[in-house]
Structure formats: C-alpha cells, structure tokens
C-alpha cells in the first residue's frame, strides 16, 4: 500500500507540471509563415525591454535594430528637430567607447553598414555586420541606450550636419510638399511641426543650452519600457538570449509617464480646405486627405487598407479608368498617409494631365461619387474575403529580403502589434464588420477633406517658413451637386477569379534541370522548380 507521503509528493509534482503548462500556454506563440526558414523567440527583460531573437541559419550576416517609441512629433515646443538631432548625437561616442567614430569604424571594417532614422512617432537605430562579429557590434551598440557621451565638443559639429541635411532638401519637392501640407493641420497636433531641425531651432539660447535639452529629452523618452530590440544572426536562440540579457539588461527604465495629446489632425471647424502648392519641378498632382479615427487598434481587420484598395482599383468601373478615358489623369494611388494612437488619415493622390488641371472639381465629383457607391450598401463579402486571401497568400510566401531591412520592420512591428502578431500583424486581415467599415467611410466626405493641388503657376499668396514654398490655403468652395458625364459607369470591382485558395504542391518529382515548355520565335518559357522553399513565383 502506498504511503500518504507518496500521494502528497505526487500531488505536488502534478501541480507543478500543471502550473508550468499553464504558464507555457499563456505565452503567446509567434505566428510564422510555413515557408519561413528562420526561428524566433520573444522575451522581455526585467527592465521592460521587449526583445525578439531571430536564428538565421546559413546566413553570413547578422543584424540588430532598436526602435524607440519617440519621434519628431514629440519635439518640445520651439525645439523642432530635437528628436532627429538626438539620433545624430548617439553615434558620437559612449562611456565605454568614447571615440566618436569607434562604432562606425568597427561596423565598416567587418563588412557591415549602419544607420538610423527618425519618423514622426519612432526612432530606429540599426546595423548589419559579418555574422562572427555580432558580439563586438553589440558591445558598441548597447551603450547608445545606456551611457551616451553627449560630448560637448561635437554638439556644434553635429548641429551643422543636421543643418546641412536640411539645406540639401530645400529644393526637393517631396520635402517641400510634405512640409507645406502641415501648414493646413491643427497647430496643436505634433505632426504639424517642422521635423528635421536647423541651426535656428537647435541653437543655444539665453535660457537654455541645446546640450542640456538633448540630455533632458534623452532621459525623459529613452526608457527601456518604450524600446523594442531585434537581434538576428546565425546563432542558437539561447546564445542570442544570453547576449540580449548581458548587453541590454542595464538599459534604464525611467519613472516618467508619457502620453501624446489626443487632438484632431485638422481643426474640424476649418474643413473643408483647398490648398495650392507651387513645385520646383514640373509636377501636376491632386491630393485628397481625409482625417479618420485611429486605425492601429483595428490592425487585424484593416478597414482603411480595404477602402484604399477599392479607391485605388484600376480596372473597369474604377475612378482611374474613367479619368483616363477623359484624358484627365495618368495615375491614382490611395493609402493611409498618417497613423498615430489617436488618429489616421487616408490620402488619394492623382497624377494629372495638363487637361486635368482645368477639371479639378469634375475629378473631385468622380471621386466622391465612387465613395458614395461604397456607402450606399454594405460592402460585398467577396471584397473582404479577397483582402483576407491575398494577405494570407503574401504572408505564406513572404520573402525577408535584406536582413537589416527585415529586423527594422520587426522592431517597428513590436511597437504596434502584440507578441504573437509581430510577423503576422502586417498581413492579418479578419473580415471587418459593416459597422466598422461605415465608421471609416463616414470620414470620406467633401466636408471632411483637405484638397491639395500641386502644379506650376498655381495661385499662391504666402510661403512655408521652412522651405520657402509658395502656397495658398483657403476654405473650399467645391459643390458636390455638379454633374459629370460618365458617373454611371463607376462600379465596384467584380469578384477576382484568379485568387488561389488551395496552396498544396503538386506531388510530381522536382527536376534537377530546366525544362523548356514553350519555344517559338516570339518567346521561350522554361520550367525549373525552386527546391528549397517551394515558392509559387515566376520571373519574366
């Protein structure tokens, strides 16, 4: 007969197993593509830093990226470009490696590259390097986020580098248009500010030194719980995990609360607006910008992506097909142009012909009529299904591309998606409800738009103070009651019969030599299957 002590011991063991299984089940598994040769591990360090480790078998390169949830829209008032300037300064020495070019030289001498960028809501630092040199690169990279030198003798030098970057873009139309359109935004919305920085915005002032403000900004925003790190290389995940802990566990977690103000992108009472921008080059463009509710929380349904795909459709019955028929446009694109935790915008950009310049109101009416079609009844389910199927196909057969680009993408995704969707989040497309679609469709109206005409010789009456671009902003006088011939030809896309649903591979044995399938005087078609990843792609 078994003793009571045995049963007590058995109970404790089973309870421990059950508890460990519960903990394992609570840990979300990262969703990966069936064709993905990499393996992954997510972990969170004790200081709150979120880390993704990527084992890349057979790779001769390693890479890492750190994203910080702070960007140019978080610049202090009157210090435009401070976040960007800070990005520059972190490259100029740390306590363990004080020489300003130590990191750069080590990366360069070991077959690598490095860079960083500051967007409106995040700042990302990254490098790639010969795989065997990853430990040394991490030695030099981690102190950026622990003990940067902020050496005073390099502050002026780097201010000049930022100003040179600004000056080099003064005649670049993309920057000029981007900056000019901010003048129509709500001045309380952080994105509306100048982002690059120059000698004026980054100068010392009687009441503040720029180095002191840099350090204060760093100590306010560069906190481990607002950072995401990706380390990728041809190493076992356990080894990568040891390096992550060893190098980054001392990144400080700062006791500073942070939230961005919840203010509208545009002042609602000022919409709709018409804006003219005079470019440097021969550009003719009409853009419609619609402020919408935030969409980041709806990433699993992608309502704005679905609307963008429909508006940007180029086939029969589309906006572009009618505009081309009339000779008014050459191209049309639609997509989300801004996204924060509080707001988003959808932009429709139309490349105009010379004739199209005199039909701006007619073009507007065609766009609005198509949007009315989207609103008149619930979207057909096949359109939602097609978005889901296409995204699933892209996810299933995704290619990583250059390793450094991939780790940048992953570190950015970690700021947006829960752990299980770090890879899948960009592709996940559940079927959105009709109510959700109507929520975003409601914002696509002639009363809720900034209409921007970019063309040589447009009427202007003021200038953008940062790029000296000639512009004009005024209340829109567009009348949506106008009649335009051909509106009745607009309709939603028919179901696409060419989207596959069965991805199973043919059991025919793979050939080791290319086979010619078609050979004529006009063309040759060869068949040679890809053996490793079985990707259903062709190259012409």
Predicted segments with their positions:
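N-terminal secretory signal peptides that target proteins for export/translocation
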Residues: 1-2
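His/Glu-rich zincin catalytic helix
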Residues: 6-14, 18-102, 135, 139-141, ...
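Acidic/histidine-enriched segments that form metal/cofactor-coordinating
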Residues: 24-30, 68, 94-217, 266, ...
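Short Gly/Ser/Thr- and Asp/Glu-enriched loop/turn motifs at secondary-structure junctions
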Residues: 119-122, 224, 343, 446
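Hydrophobic alpha-helical scaffolding
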Residues: 167, 171, 204, 230-234, ...
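Non-catalytic interaction/regulatory segments
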Residues: 257-264, 359-510
């Amino acid at each position: 007969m078994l003793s009571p002590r045995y049963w007590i011991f058995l109970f404790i063991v089973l309870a421990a197993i059950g508890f460990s299984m519960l903990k394992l089940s609570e840990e979300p598994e990262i969703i990966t593509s069936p064709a993905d040769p990499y393996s992954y591990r997510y972990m969170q360090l004790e200081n709150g830093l979120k880390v993704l480790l990527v084992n890349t078998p057979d790779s001769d390169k390693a890479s890492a990226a750190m994203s910080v949830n702070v960007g140019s829209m978080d610049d202090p008032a009157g210090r435009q470009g401070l976040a960007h300037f800070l990005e520059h300064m972190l490259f100029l020495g740390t306590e363990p490696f004080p020489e300003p070019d130590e990191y750069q030289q080590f990366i360069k001498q070991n077959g690598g590259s490095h860079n960083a960028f500051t967007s409106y809501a995040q700042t990302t630092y990254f490098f790639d390097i010969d795989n065997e040199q990853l430990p040394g690169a991490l030695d030099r990279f981690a102190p950026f986020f622990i003990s940067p030198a902020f050496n005073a003798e390099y502050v002026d030098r780097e201010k000049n580098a930022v100003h040179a970057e600004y000056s080099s873009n003064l005649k670049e139309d993309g920057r000029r248009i981007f900056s000019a359109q901010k003048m129509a935004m709500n001045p309380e919305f952080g994105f509306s500010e100048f982002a690059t920085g120059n000698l004026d915005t980054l100068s010392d002032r009687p009441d503040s030194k720029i180095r002191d403000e840099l350090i204060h900004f760093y100590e306010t925003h560069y906190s481990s719980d607002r950072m995401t790190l990706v380390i990728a290389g041809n190493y076992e995940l356990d080894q990568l995990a040891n390096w992550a802990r060893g190098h980054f566990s001392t990144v400080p977690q700062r006791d500073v609360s942070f939230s961005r103000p919840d203010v509208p992108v545009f002042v609602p009472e000022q919409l709709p607006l018409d804006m003219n921008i005079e470019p440097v080059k021969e550009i003719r463009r009409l853009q419609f910008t619609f402020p919408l509710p935030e969409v980041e929380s709806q990433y699993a349904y992608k309502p704005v992506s679905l609307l963008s795909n429909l508006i940007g459709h180029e086939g029969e019955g589309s906006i572009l097909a009618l505009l081309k028929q009339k000779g008014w446009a050459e191209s049309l694109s639609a997509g989300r142009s801004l996204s924060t935790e509080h707001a988003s915008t959808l932009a429709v950009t139309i490349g105009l012909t010379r004739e199209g310049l005199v039909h701006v109101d007619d073009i507007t009416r065609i766009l609005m009529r198509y949007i009315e079609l989207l609103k008149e009844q619930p979207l057909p389910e096949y359109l939602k299904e097609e978005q889901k199927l296409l995204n699933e196909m892209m996810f299933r057969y995704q290619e990583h591309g250059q390793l450094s680009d991939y780790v940048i993408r992953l570190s950015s995704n970690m700021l947006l998606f829960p752990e299980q969707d770090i890879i899948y989040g960009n592709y996940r497309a559940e079927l959105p409800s009709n109510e959700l679609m109507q929520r975003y469709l409601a914002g696509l109206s002639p009363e809720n738009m900034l209409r921007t005409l970019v063309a040589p010789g447009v009427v202007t009456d003021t200038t953008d103070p940062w790029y000296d671009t000639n512009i004009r902003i005024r209340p829109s006088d567009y009348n949506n009651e106008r009649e335009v011939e051909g509106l009745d030809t607009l309709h939603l896309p028919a179901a696409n019969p060419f989207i596959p649903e069965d991805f199973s591979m043919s059991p025919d044995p793979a050939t080791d030599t290319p086979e010619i399938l078609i050979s004529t005087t006009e063309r040759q078609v060869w068949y040679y299957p890809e053996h490793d990843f079985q990707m259903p792609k062709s190259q012409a």
